[in-house]
Amino acid sequence: FWLFTWGQAESVIANDWMPLSYLFALVALFLVPFRTLPSAGRTRFLQTLRRVSVGGIAEAQDGKFGDILLADVLTSYAKVGGDLFVALCMFITPGSSSTGRPDRSCGGTLIVPLILAVPSLIRFRQCVIEYLRVKRAPYKESTGWGGQHLANALKYSTAFPVIITAAMLRLADGEAAKAACYRAWLVAVLINSFYSFYWDVTKDWDLTLLTSQRES
């Protein structure tokens, strides 16, 4: 694309359809059942995506790890999803271009925050489902009473204040309101970042760097 446009601003804006055509082709590979391509993997992926998209999670023997992995991928790419929506919105908006300066209010002020929040909401619901499964099952010392799943759900819930305060900051009118929203956003970001860092190090990676088990 950059070789075709030579990096010239006018050409980049005029040919905004080129980078988006790749995205449409990628989606088509997943959705259109081409006979020349293997269908088993695509079918399995779409089934998992359908289950995960509503916050569902399979049993351990039915692919629970894959559901968690896909939901975590969606969480990691939440910002990318929001940016893609903005690009598509600007592409179909008359007088705008998807390769121009991003207009994050395109399509309304609530859609992008909702797109950012959905992946975290999916993982939050999955954690709650896992907690309820532990509560219904006979007690096992290896799984405990399910508190770890609630703590994991709390980790994903800390993303919501970040998204809400960021949206409020974008809509704030006046320096005082912007300063207050910025401080609230900064506190929310710090809580989310430190909680996520602690959880990843001690739980997901099983490191003792931040625990009392660390050897001196």
Pin down the residues of each PLM region:
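Alpha-helical, bilayer-embedded segments
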Residues: F1-E215
